Amino acid sequence: MTNKLLSIKIADPYAEAFFQLSLSLYIKNNDPDLFYQLIFDIQDFLKLLKETPELDNFLKNPLNSNILKKNILNKIIENKFNLQTINFLNLLIDKKRIDTIQTIGKIFLEKAYEFVCIKFVEVWSTIELSQKQQENLIQKINILLGPIFSEPSVQFYKIQLTLMLDTNLLGGLIIKMGSKIIDLSLRNELQQLGKKLDITI
């Protein structure tokens, strides 16, 4: 079993547990805002780790005690995150699973996005997309995905874009939706042409 598959196998039960907790709080309190708050918390925490590698490395370091990790973490997030999220992160520290939080968070968000009909789409481009270009892209993705048929109405997915720059593309876009990748980059077109002409690009 590869490290990635092992990480997913370890992470999935924790992601599912937090997802079920989020749903139970939503249903019990009839409060969708609380459900969305937990989603936003995980989004923000993953972003925090990405932007602060020092914190990420500190939490992953087995030489740091659980108490120290929780003290540092709680000082950073106690006034920003919901108590349920904080308790969950502390649990991961106690279970020595905080090092898999990126995988846990990603799986949780996929489950949550699917529940609320949100598609998390990653887009790589050579230049920043304008608001109009983003709106046009969302429309095209919705056409590609098709409508959701649910009684008593038909609706479309809510598309959440994560935009990233990659100058190596030369032009065009790469779109990733779950395990599906749509490569519309000029680099890919040149590579395909190169294969036909037996040229390495």
Curated annotation (Swiss-Prot):
Source domain of life: Eukaryota
Keywords attached to this entry: ATP synthesis, CF(1), Chloroplast, Hydrogen ion transport, Ion transport, Membrane, Plastid, Thylakoid, Transport
SUPFAM superfamilies referenced in this protein's UniProt entry, alphabetically: N-terminal domain of the delta subunit of the F1F0-ATP synthase (SSF47928)
Entry keyword Ligase: no
Entry-linked Pfam families: OSCP
Protein's UniProt keywords contain Ligase: no
Main location: plastid
Protein location: Plastid, Chloroplast thylakoid membrane
GO cellular component: chloroplast thylakoid membrane; proton-transporting ATP synthase complex
GO molecular function: proton-transporting ATP synthase activity, rotational mechanism
Membrane association type: Peripheral membrane protein
InterPro entries: ATP_synth_OSCP/delta_N_sf, ATPase_OSCP/d_CS, ATPase_OSCP/dsu
Biological function: F(1)F(0) ATP synthase produces ATP from ADP in the presence of a proton or sodium gradient. F-type ATPases consist of two structural domains, F(1) containing the extramembraneous catalytic core and F(0) containing the membrane proton channel, linked together by a central stalk and a peripheral stalk. During catalysis, ATP synthesis in the catalytic domain of F(1) is coupled via a rotary mechanism of the central stalk subunits to proton translocation. This protein is part of the stalk that links CF(0) to CF(1). It either transmits conformational changes from CF(0) to CF(1) or is implicated in proton conduction.
Subunit structure: F-type ATPases have 2 components, F(1) - the catalytic core - and F(0) - the membrane proton channel. F(1) has five subunits: alpha(3), beta(3), gamma(1), delta(1), epsilon(1). CF(0) has four main subunits: a(1), b(1), b'(1) and c(10-14). The alpha and beta chains form an alternating ring which encloses part of the gamma chain. F(1) is attached to F(0) by a central stalk formed by the gamma and epsilon chains, while a peripheral stalk is formed by the delta, b and b' chains.
Family per record: Belongs to the ATPase delta chain family.
Full protein name: ATP synthase subunit delta, chloroplastic
